[in-house]
């Protein structure tokens, strides 16, 4: 190990120790067993480390470096070992993913087929997470606060969850006393996962419906009447999957989507809209009969160093 790598390893380990001490009691107070420990805190170690129960999920963000491919693989393994040793997690419970810039297909890239799944807990609820097979685990930790806010508004509401992924917002809504939930995602894999998450928390019955569909097409095909009172729209930045009608780009498609949703929301109804697209620009004047308020400062959790991990708006139907 050269001197530079040793220094990077030591700085990474020191930061992990400090964060682990700082967050020692925090998860219990917040009723969570999955949270962010490290987020590129040391610039030369551009990794993200999340804890799920007694496991670690580590991701690398692409960044230029002067190592050969083999040298970089060796460097990554040293950093992964450092995290395991520092946080006293067995190496077999540490999962590493390379997170490349999105260049095609879906945001939810498949990287394996091992099927290593565990239960994670958040806000008194249980979620199935897959640590081995996808770049993402099935639970977006940066929306923990948003989910809690959504639950707080769900009592007796007819809830619509578009681009639902594994259905965590539907689970929170059902727990908040929603009259009904409608969960929509084009991926059958994630739709089945959403159903499993609902069942795990005891939410079954005809009032909870699931649809495998392109979200925009699904809404357009609904009658133009107030079918819902509360909605969440958390789309990918883009997608060009063959299973959806057309390429999706959030910046150019959000206006028609939100206007279509608004036409099916009751007066005074609420839409939560979020995006991870860093350069996204919201044009409030293009939205029909909607009062728009950005709430990103309230929705990004305190364990996230990157306060721009997402942007979020609470939109009210006039």
Predicted regions and their residues:
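Non-catalytic accessory regions of SAM-dependent methyltransferases
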Residues: 1-55, 61-62
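Non-catalytic substrate-recognition/targeting regions of SAM-dependent transferases
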Residues: 48-50, 74-140, 148
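Conserved class I S-adenosyl-L-methionine
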Residues: 156-165
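Conserved SAM-binding loop of SAM-dependent methyltransferases across substrates and taxa
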Residues: 166-178
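Conserved SAM-binding motif I beta-strand of class I
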Residues: 180-185
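S-adenosyl-L-methionine
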Residues: 186-230
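Mobile active-site "lid"/loop adjacent to the S-adenosyl-L-methionine
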Residues: 190, 212-216, 229-260
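C-terminal catalytic and target-recognition region of SAM-dependent MTase-like enzymes
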Residues: 269-318
């Amino acid at each position: 190990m050269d001197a530079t790598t040793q220094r990077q390893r030591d700085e990474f380990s020191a930061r992990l120790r400090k964060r682990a001490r700082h967050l020692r009691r925090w998860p219990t107070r917040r009723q969570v067993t999955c949270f962010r420990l490290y987020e590129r805190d040391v610039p030369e170690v551009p990794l993200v480390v999340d804890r799920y129960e007694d496991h670690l999920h580590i991701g690398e963000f692409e960044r230029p470096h002067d190592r050969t491919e083999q040298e970089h693989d060796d460097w990554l393994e040293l950093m992964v070992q450092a995290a395991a040793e520092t946080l006293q997690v067995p190496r077999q419970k540490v999962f590493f993913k390379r997170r490349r810039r999105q260049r095609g297909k879906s945001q939810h890239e498949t990287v394996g087929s091992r099927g290593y799944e565990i239960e994670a807990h958040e806000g008194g609820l249980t979620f199935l997470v897959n640590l081995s097979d996808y770049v993402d685990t099935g639970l977006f930790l940066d929306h923990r606060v948003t989910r809690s806010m959504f639950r707080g508004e769900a009592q007796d509401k007819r809830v619509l969850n578009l681009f639902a992924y594994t259905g965590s917002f539907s689970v929170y809504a059902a727990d908040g006393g929603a009259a009904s939930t409608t969960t929509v995602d084009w991926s059958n894999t994630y739709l089945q996962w959403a159903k499993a998450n609902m069942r795990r928390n005891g939410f079954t019955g005809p009032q909870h419906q699931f649809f495998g569909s392109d979200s925009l097409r699904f809404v357009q095909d609904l009658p133009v009447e107030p079918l819902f009172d509360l909605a969440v729209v958390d789309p990918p930045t883009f997608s060009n999957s063959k299973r959806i009608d057309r390429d999706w780009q959030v910046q150019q498609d959000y206006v028609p989507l939100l206007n279509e949703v608004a036409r099916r929301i009751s007066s005074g109804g609420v839409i939560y809209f979020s995006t991870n697209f860093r350069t996204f620009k919201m044009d409030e004047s293009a939205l029909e009969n909607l009062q728009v308020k950005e709430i990103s400062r309230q929705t990004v959790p305190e364990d996230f160093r990157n306060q721009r991990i997402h942007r979020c708006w609470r939109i009210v139907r006039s």
